[in-house]
């Protein structure tokens, strides 16, 4: 076994390196000391550095418009934009390309694009999604690119410029650190960009219950954990239970977090009634004012903790302060999310999902819909559309896709959105923001192309496939807000023939070869289903 560098954590030296060398069976039980309860350190994927790319993206700063779309769509968080102030730019490696940052609030800042070359999978999604594809970014054979990581390592030390950006924009979101990186998903994966975006918006305040399936396989393949922490040591509190109980598992997490916060709140109230210190009372007042505001609550909590740690109290007051400080991690508002695929949400875990939503708690779901059981090889699910070929549906699925969004709208308190990243990134960000802000259950259903679809143009065109799915009426974009009872249809009337979209994927095109008569009937039904669905949504949006 090739030894690990001396400056890496013990888990890398003692566990990751031996396992990746196919020597995991030789590990003694003592190697797992401290992990008896199943917990694992975050961020171990950054040490793998597999170096599997045959081609790498090379950035041309003179052609770049700094839209950050390349970073937005990257399935493995390999390509990222950075902002540098004058001092940081002066200390940067001499060969690092820096240009003036464009946009509001960017005065005095430099902009660069970093690529973690040893973590890239050569999918090419960045290049195919670039508005100036072939100019601002090009895929170049790996042997022609420097693999030196000095520049990348320097960029990881830089603080974020959060006061200069709006994280709820495509460009701004990508100037925040992704808290899931270098995962084990397929090259070009359609699932991972969604969860990466979610971590960039809320990752340092997020609890995540992950259903079994592909999202668990690439998110927790022992010993590689792609979920990581920011420079403050905060990251996604991630866990997985089973396929069939993820919603219930998340509900339990939600109730536990709620109870823990209620406990510390009682101590804060008690201190407020005891102390006469004006600074302490002001900090407590602000903490209560921002109690339900995710971002403001975090700031107010830090300010209150700073005041508590710097103020002299009486012995009686200090006893209460000690109880508060002991529970400091429970003080700020957290956001609760479930994450999984259609095999979980439409099928195996649907009963639990329905039950949890009926309870009315403030839980959120990010559902990546690949329309098959992806992790186990492409078996048909209730999300599989009519006419698609999948395992157990070799002659084409005879029934139409279950409309999970409409089913959940029958509850009067559930926020529902349907999104497709490549079709409308801004609608996706808006939906996630609205879902998190909704005081009750919410679900964001995301179209996620998969290798099981057999995209003829290749997995480097996943984002275009998302766009074509909407343009053809195969997939619709909408948002439903139960607070206002408003249904907003965000996709326009189809401009692309549905058949043109379907024939571009092997899961449909193969049916014409193996069962041509079935294809004729089922594709006609698919056309009718798409037309009916759009007309129904259109009527619903018109009130």
Residue ranges and their predicted role:
Residues 69, 125, 196-200, 263-266, ...:
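Alpha-helical scaffold segments in soluble metabolic enzymes
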């Amino acid at each position: 076994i090739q030894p690990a560098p001396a400056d890496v954590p013990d888990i890398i030296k003692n566990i990751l390196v031996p396992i990746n060398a196919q020597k995991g069976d030789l590990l003694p039980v003592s190697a797992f000391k401290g992990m008896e309860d199943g917990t694992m350190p975050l961020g171990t994927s950054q040490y793998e550095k597999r170096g599997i790319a045959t081609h790498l993206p090379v950035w041309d700063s003179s052609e770049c418009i700094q839209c950050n779309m390349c970073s937005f769509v990257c399935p493995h968080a390999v390509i990222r934009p950075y902002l540098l102030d004058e001092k940081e730019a002066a200390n940067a490696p001499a060969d690092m390309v820096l240009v003036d940052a464009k946009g509001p609030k960017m005065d005095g800042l430099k902009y660069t694009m970093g690529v973690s070359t040893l973590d890239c999978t050569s999918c090419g999604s960045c290049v195919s999604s670039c508005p100036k594809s072939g100019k601002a970014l090009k895929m170049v054979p790996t042997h022609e690119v420097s693999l030196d990581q000095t520049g990348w390592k320097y960029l990881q030390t830089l603080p974020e410029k959060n006061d200069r950006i709006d994280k709820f924009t495509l460009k701004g979101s990508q100037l925040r650190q992704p808290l899931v990186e270098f995962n084990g998903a397929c090259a070009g994966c359609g699932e991972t960009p969604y969860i990466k975006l979610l971590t960039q918006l809320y990752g340092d305040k997020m609890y995540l219950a992950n259903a079994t399936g592909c999202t668990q396989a690439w998110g927790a393949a022992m010993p590689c954990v792609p979920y990581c922490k920011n420079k403050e040591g905060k990251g996604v509190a991630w866990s997985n239970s089973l396929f069939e109980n993820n919603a219930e598992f998340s509900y339990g997490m939600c109730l536990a977090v709620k109870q823990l916060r209620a406990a510390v709140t009682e101590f804060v109230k008690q201190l407020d009634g005891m102390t006469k210190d004006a600074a302490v009372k002001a900090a407590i007042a602000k903490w209560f004012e921002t109690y339900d505001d995710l971002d403001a609550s975090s700031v107010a909590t830090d300010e209150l903790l700073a005041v508590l740690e710097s103020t002299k109290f009486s012995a009686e007051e200090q006893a209460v302060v000690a109880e508060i400080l002991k529970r400091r991690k429970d003080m700020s508002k957290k956001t609760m999310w479930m994450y999984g695929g259609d095999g979980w949400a439409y099928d195996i875990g649907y009963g639990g999902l329905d039950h949890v939503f009926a309870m009315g708690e403030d839980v959120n779901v990010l559902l990546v819909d690949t329309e098959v059981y992806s992790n186990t090889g492409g078996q048909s699910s209730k999300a599989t559309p009519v006419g698609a070929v999948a395992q157990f549906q070799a002659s084409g699925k005879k029934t139409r896709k279950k409309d999970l969004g409409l089913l959940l709208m029958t509850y009067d308190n559930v926020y529902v959105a349907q999104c497709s990243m490549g079709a409308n990134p801004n609608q996706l960000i808006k939906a996630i923001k609205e879902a998190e802000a909704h005081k009750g259950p919410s679900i964001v259903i995301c179209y996620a192309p998969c290798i099981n679809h057999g995209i003829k143009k290749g997995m480097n065109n996943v984002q275009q496939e998302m766009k074509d799915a909407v343009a053809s009426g195969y997939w619709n974009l909408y948002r439903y807000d139960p607070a206002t009872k408003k249904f907003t249809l965000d996709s326009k009337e189809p401009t692309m023939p549905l058949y043109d979209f379907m024939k571009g994927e092997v899961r449909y095109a193969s049916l014409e070869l193996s069962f041509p008569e079935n294809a004729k009937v089922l594709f006609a039904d698919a056309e009718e289903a798409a037309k009916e669905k759009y007309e129904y949504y259109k009527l619903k949006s018109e009130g």
